[in-house]
Structures are given as C-alpha cells and as structure tokens.
C-alpha cells in the first residue's frame, strides 16, 4: 500500500490548509507575507521575449535595448485609455460589468474598429 508523500499528485488530498482558527495572511507574526504586485512589477510581466515576438511579427530584425521599456509604457497608455473609455460606456449603461461590446465601442471611438464581436 502506497503512502501519500504530500506532493499533491496522489488521489484526493486536502491541498493547503491554514489550520484551525487561522486568518490566512494575518495568521501570526512569523508567517509568510503575501507580496502584492506593484504597478512596476505588472509592467515587467510583459517580458522581453514577448515584446521581441511582437516585433518579429511586425518584421523587425534587431531591437535596441531601450525599446522594451518604451514599448511597455506605450502599451500601458493605450490600455489605460481603452479601459477608461470602456468603463465610461459601462457606467452610462448603469452596469457594473464591462462587456466585450464596451471594449469594441471604446476601440471604435479611438479609430481602431474591431470586427467579429457583434
């Protein structure tokens, strides 16, 4: 009879438990802290290889090192504007959930019509 090694690959199992009366991240002073992502960390999530793949798709052969940070900043500005417009459409419709059509209308407003989401 095999014993469970706790690797998480066996039958059943309870997974990670916090213990009786535990409060998760606030469990005790000596507990492991949960690190929240800062905005800078989130921008670094768009990796150099991902930017390189996008550039290759656009026909770029060589990339200067300064391009990566600039690409992240431009992408951040673009997404902020699209999200801001999408939320405006959502609020005008008195909803709390942003729909795909809100994003389509926001892109259309910026002159970037997206087809296929009607």
UniProtKB/Swiss-Prot annotation:
On whether Ribonucleoprotein is a keyword of this UniProt record, the answer is no
InterPro entries, per the entry: CENP-T/H4_C, Histone-fold, Histone_H4
- Enumerate the GO terms in the molecular function aspect: DNA binding; protein heterodimerization activity; structural constituent of chromatin
Sorted alphabetically, the Gene Ontology cellular component annotations on this record are: nucleosome; nucleus
Task: Please classify the protein's predominant subcellular localization into one broad category.
Answer: nucleus
Which residue ranges are recorded for the region named Disordered? Answer: 1-39
Q: Could you tell me which CDD domains the record lists for this protein? A: HFD_H4 (cd22912)
Q: Name one Pfam family in it.
A: CENP-T_C
Give the SUPFAM superfamilies listed for this entry. Histone-fold
Quote the subcellular location field of this record: Nucleus; Chromosome
The answer to whether keyword Nucleus applies is yes
Coiled-coil region(s)? none
Instruction: Write down the Gene3D superfamilies for this protein, in alphabetical order.
Output: Histone, subunit A
Q: Where is the composition biased (Gly residues)?
A: 7-22
Q: Which UniProt keywords apply?
A: Chromosome, DNA-binding, Nucleosome core, Nucleus
Q: Which domain of life is it from?
A: Eukaryota
The Gene Ontology biological process terms listed for this entry are: nucleosome assembly
State how it assembles: The nucleosome is a histone octamer containing two molecules each of H2A, H2B, H3 and H4 assembled in one H3-H4 heterotetramer and two H2A-H2B heterodimers. The octamer wraps approximately 147 bp of DNA.
What function does this protein fulfil?
A: Core component of nucleosome. Nucleosomes wrap and compact DNA into chromatin, limiting DNA accessibility to the cellular machineries which require DNA as a template. Histones thereby play a central role in transcription regulation, DNA repair, DNA replication and chromosomal stability. DNA accessibility is regulated via a complex set of post-translational modifications of histones, also called histone code, and nucleosome remodeling.
So what family is this one in? Belongs to the histone H4 family.
Q: Give the protein's recorded name.
A: Histone H4
Q: Which organism is it from?
A: Entamoeba histolytica (strain ATCC 30459 / HM-1:IMSS / ABRM)
